[in-house]
UniProtKB/Swiss-Prot annotation:
Residues 77-268 form the ABC transmembrane type-1 domain. GO terms for biological process: transmembrane transport. It is found in: Cell inner membrane. The keyword Kinase does not apply. It comes from Shigella dysenteriae serotype 1 (strain Sd197). It comes from the Bacteria. This is sn-glycerol-3-phosphate transport system permease protein UgpE. The keyword NAD does not apply. Belongs to the binding-protein-dependent transport system permease family. UgpAE subfamily. The complex is composed of two ATP-binding proteins (UgpC), two transmembrane proteins (UgpA and UgpE) and a solute-binding protein (UgpB). The chain crosses the membrane at residues 16-36, 85-105, 113-133, 142-162, 202-222, 247-267. Part of the ABC transporter complex UgpBAEC involved in sn-glycerol-3-phosphate (G3P) import. Probably responsible for the translocation of the substrate across the membrane. The lineage of its organism: Bacteria, Pseudomonadati, Pseudomonadota, Gammaproteobacteria, Enterobacterales. It is a multi-pass membrane protein. Keywords: Cell inner membrane, Cell membrane, Membrane, Transmembrane, Transmembrane helix, Transport.
């Protein structure tokens, strides 16, 4: 029997409310700043009451971009979406097929190949990123969607997760498929893929957010303003030296940048949670 402790309930709810407040208050301040004009946003202290310039600020960056030499913000949003979706689709496809081959095909040194993939997790990003940039430059893929997305499609983490899931699938499924005369790809498409849908949903959300939040890679690969992404664009709005940052425009751009990943999480919330729970069973 669980003992009822009112003080513990009050304490846990208080901590929950404080945690939510700590998370939401900066977002509220950003929203308020996005609704103010240039003068009001620099007032000390800045008001916490929303203003009336939100649509004006959004229209300004939507049409004129985030700086004197930048593409319109809608273009940056489109580039970020193409980048995130391409990375997600490619990462899931490559990782799933790699794990399928490692688990279900009996070929020499297959475990060695897996550990060669897995050991890349031990290398810091800083160690891998500059050789990757050199390869992309030699392949003439700078300033292109291919250079922006292809190097980020390989994932040791996703391959490991799919491998662990495939290993718990019963061998009877393979035997039944062989008796029915199914080819490996038929077995993959008709049996393995449907059983992996919850894991796919969880990985889709995580990978999309990972691709959407990329900052350093686009900064190294892209010099064409028409291929710029939102995260790098927002960083470019923050002035250095004696320049003045238009924080109302920065916060408006940040709010627009939040919308796509939030929509993805809300739409796939059930499948995302179910995928995380099922993967631990």
């Amino acid at each position: 029997m669980i003992e009822n402790r009112p003080w513990l309930t009050i304490f846990s709810h208080t901590m929950l409310i404080l945690g939510i407040a700590v998370i939401l208050f900066p977002l509220y301040v950003a929203f308020v700043a996005a609704t103010l004009d240039k003068q009001a946003v620099y007032a000390a202290p800045m008001t916490l009451i929303p203003g009336t310039h939100l649509l004006e600020n959004i229209h300004n960056i939507w049409v004129n971009g985030v700086g004197t030499n930048s593409a319109p913000f809608w273009r940056m949003l489109l580039n970020s979406f193409v980048m995130a979706f391409s990375i997600t689709l490619g990462k899931i496809t490559v990782s799933m097929l790699s794990a399928f081959a490692i688990v279900w095909f009996r070929f020499p040194l297959r475990n060695l190949f897996f550990w060669m993939i897995f050991i890349t997790l031990m290398l810091p990003v800083e160690v891998r990123i500059f050789p990757t940039v050199e390869v992309i430059a030699n392949l003439k893929m700078l300033d292109s969607y291919a250079g922006l997305t292809l190097p980020l499609m390989a994932s040791a983490t996703a391959t490991f997760l799919f491998r662990q899931f495939f290993m718990i699938l019963p061998d009877e499924l393979v035997e039944a498929a062989r008796i029915d005369g199914a080819s490996p790809m038929r077995f993959f498409c008709d049996i393995v893929f449907p059983l992996s849908k919850t894991n796919l949903a969880a990985l889709f959300v995580i990978t999309f957010i990972y691709g959407w939040n990329q900052y350093l890679w686009p900064l190294l690969i892209i010099t064409d303003v028409d291929l710029g992404t939102t995260v790098a664009g927002i960083k470019g709005m923050i002035a250095t030296g004696e320049g003045t940052t238009e924080w109302n425009s920065v916060m408006a751009a940040m709010l627009l940048t939040l919308i796509p990943p939030v929509v993805i999480v809300l739409v796939m919330q059930r499948a995302f949670v179910r995928g995380l729970v099922d993967s631990e069973k």
